[in-house]
Amino acid sequence: MKKWIGITLGICMIWVLSACGSTPAVTETTSTTETAKNKKIASISIFLTGDLMALGIKPAATTTSDYLPITGEQYQGIQYLGFTKEPDMEALIGLQPDEIFIDAEFADKLGLDKLEQIATTHVINLDEGRWQDHLRAIAQIVDRTDNAESFITAYDAKAKEVSALFKKEIGNGKVLAMRVSAKGFRIYGMDRPLGPILFEDLKLNPSPDVTKIDKNWENISKEILPDLDADAIFVLVSSVDEGSDQVFEKLQSDPIWLGLKAVKNQKVYMITEQPWLDYSASGNLQALEQLEKLLSEK
């Protein structure tokens, strides 16, 4: 794979005009490169950033999503490249990274040949497998497989502890995760971001209707909530859509909400978008730690 050491103004102009010459396409890879130590890595995905950090690698730059701001101590010193959907390509070129990691969802949209002219590019398909698979794939690339296995072992132990704590609260009761925003209500299915951590890692029992959702989430009306018959509800309130807090405040006085089994039994658990929607190794570990703290305070 080609990797340009010098970045010139001509490249910037070529990028803007989308007139780059033909270069080999980048394919998904599990080949091992030299260790990532001292390498300058750019991550075109906040989720891949979380996986890299779980391996002890702090990327030089990252993109993110509007609902996952890169605030917090762990992101200090990392250059912000904008949103993953529309990254700041000029800043990426100026960074002169050694390697780029990108989510397959956005690789074709941004142009793999153009990314490859900047640096060796690794494509990870986050829609295939679970976060453990993604972590292992990245670990193979950066030669940190031992780190990946150690992380997963520690994570599994933490998940077992937190699961036991939660089941003391609800036993084998049915669980539901929902998001409240000014645009409406949604419930999360069995797939990422929340399905795997809740129903696979923590081994909680999903509400039967949750298992029928064949996508990441499904929009619903509040009138549907009683039919879901959840014994416990995880609630996220959108930080992006203005007025979402007011919508949730109004919902809490609604007879439909007040009549829910989980509400009457005080089994509503307020969680936050960061880290719960950060479907990465480090994001999921932080989510477990947040839930553990939440349960200890009840």
Q: For the regions a protein language model found, what residue spans apply to each?
A:
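Proline-aspartate-enriched helix->loop->beta-strand connector
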Residues: 96-102, 120, 225, 229-233
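His/Asp/Glu-enriched short active-site or ligand-binding loop at hydrolase and phosphoryl-transfer sites
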Residues: 66-67, 194-216
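Basic- and aromatic-lined ligand-binding clefts that recognize polyanionic substrates
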Residues: 40-52, 150-205
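N-terminal, intrinsically disordered, polar/charged segments of Gram-positive cell-envelope systems
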Residues: 23-40
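Sec-dependent N-terminal signal peptides of Gram-positive bacterial secreted proteins and lipoproteins
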Residues: 1-25
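Extracytoplasmic substrate-binding proteins
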Residues: 114-183, 278, 282-298
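Structured C-terminal subdomain patch of bacterial secreted/periplasmic proteins
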Residues: 40, 232-298
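A short, structured surface patch at a secondary-structure boundary
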Residues: 45-94, 99, 104
